[in-house]
């Protein structure tokens, strides 16, 4: 039997400079012309770009596997090309193994667990804004350190080292794989994370506290306690998921609010609108743009002939702008409701940190608007991530504002002497 060719073939590389310059336009074209298409980039993969394809694939774990395999090289299975991270539980597991691990993660990321973190989140947001508030000018991206500090602190690690975790885990998914930054993350920063986190797990095994790491040590998976390797696997994923995504959401939202002063004023006048606005920011900015799966068997999928072992990229960002699902999808309507966006993914792997991410984003946007309501962004000075393929966002957002007063009695972290 002759093999069906993979088609239609498109010119698409989500890690290219061309894509970074206009990822919204690139996905619009794909969605309109061939929502399930093959590209030869990075060894070849399918790109799923319309809402129905992404919806169907993300709910079909039987055909679209998240498990680590030899297809597409070595490393983290859910991105293309794969990145050299440790095995990540539960995101690289399919059912049935997946379920009991996800239950253990849900226990520390549930809405109730996140409500207990309210004061911690507020403290970090206040402390980060304190660091810049008296100056009248700063890089707004600095405030984006909050999610990393909260995540690291929640796991019981030293929050003052939050930047080292960002340099490691966020860089692997936001810097071009051929850059010096990426090589530093892979060869220096990630090994440091592994050494530090493994030492932390060992210390908590000796002496548990009330942090999330101790909760994993006490949790049962299939009627047994987890090994250090399993716990490390979960912690590295939580750090990886926690440090960059919310920062990307908030910084993009703050730049948009600067460009749309009328909408900014509405949120200043009525902060209770922020919750719904955050959902719209999630939809249009889609911090995690696209993640991957591996096809488990030859199959026909929405007109395309998939083969076992093919890699597939599901674009949440593109699905989130599908006009068949959202009226005027390129309009940012901060009152849009309902808003069935897929920014947190869909199906069994839907983001375990969504409640934490939302809580941090609401607190950060709320406090910036309250304490720095007149911030002016130097738009020409904005530096985007050079690669917008997996995570979209900004590295730097110079801004000025009317100075204000610090609120915490002392800085969050000891000052370097
Ligand atoms: C705005 C913030 C966030 C966005 C946009 C986001 C996005 C996503 C997406 C799209 C997925 C689906 C992965 C897949 O289907 O393969 C996911 C999964 C996940 N996220 Fe998030 N995330 C955010 C915040 C967080 C935070 C704060 C944490 C934890 C500290 C976190 C931890 C996780 C974990 C553990 C998974 C894997 C769940 C599983 O495999 O069952 N995320 N996230």
Model-derived features: positions:
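Cytochrome P450
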Residues: 1-417
């Amino acid at each position: 039997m002759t093999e069906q060719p993979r088609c239609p073939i498109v010119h698409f590389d989500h890690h290219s400079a061309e894509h970074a310059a206009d990822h919204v336009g690139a996905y619009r074209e794909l969605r309109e012309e061939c929502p399930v298409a093959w590209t030869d980039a990075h060894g070849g993969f399918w790109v799923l770009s319309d809402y129905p394809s992404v919806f169907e694939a993300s709910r079909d774990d039987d055909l679209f596997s998240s498990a680590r395999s030899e297809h597409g090289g070595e490393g983290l299975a859910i991105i293309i090309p794969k990145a050299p991270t440790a095995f990540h539980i539960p995101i690289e597991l399919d059912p049935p193994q997946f379920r009991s691990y996800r239950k253990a993660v849900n226990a520390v990321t549930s809405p109730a667990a996140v409500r207990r973190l309210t004061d911690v989140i507020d403290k970090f947001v206040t402390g980060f804004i304190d660091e810049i508030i008296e100056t009248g000018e700063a890089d707004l991206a600095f405030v984006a350190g909050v999610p990393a500090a909260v995540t690291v602190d929640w796991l019981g690690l030293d929050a003052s080292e939050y930047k080292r975790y960002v340099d490691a885990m966020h860089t692997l998914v936001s810097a071009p794989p051929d850059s010096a930054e990426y090589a530093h993350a892979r060869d220096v920063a990630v090994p440091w994370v592994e050494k530090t986190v493994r030492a932390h797990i060992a210390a908590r095994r000796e002496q548990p506290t009330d942090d999330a790491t101790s909760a994993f040590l006490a949790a049962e998976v299939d009627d047994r306690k987890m090994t250090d390797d399993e716990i490390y696997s979960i912690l590295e994923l939580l750090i990886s998921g926690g440090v960059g995504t919310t920062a990307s959401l908030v910084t993009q939202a703050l730049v948009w609010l600067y460009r749309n002063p009328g909408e900014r004023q509405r949120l200043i006048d009525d902060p209770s609108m922020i919750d719904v606005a955050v959902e719209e920011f999630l939809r249009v900015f889609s911090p995690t743009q696209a993640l991957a799966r591996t096809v488990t068997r030859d199959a026909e999928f929405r007109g395309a002939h998939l083969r076992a072992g093919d890699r597939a990229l599901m674009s949440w960002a593109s699905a989130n702008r599908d006009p068949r699902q959202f009226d005027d999808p390129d309009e940012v309507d901060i009152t849009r409701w309902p808003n069935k966006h897929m920014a947190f993914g869909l199906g069994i792997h839907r983001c375990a940190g969504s409640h934490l991410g939302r809580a941090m984003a609401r607190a950060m946007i709320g406090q910036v608007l309250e304490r720095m309501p007149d911030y002016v962004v130097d738009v020409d000075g904005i530096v985007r991530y050079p690669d917008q393929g997996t995570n979209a966002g900004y590295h730097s957002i110079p801004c000025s504002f009317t100075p204000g007063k610090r609120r915490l009695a002392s800085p969050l972290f000891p000052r370097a002497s």
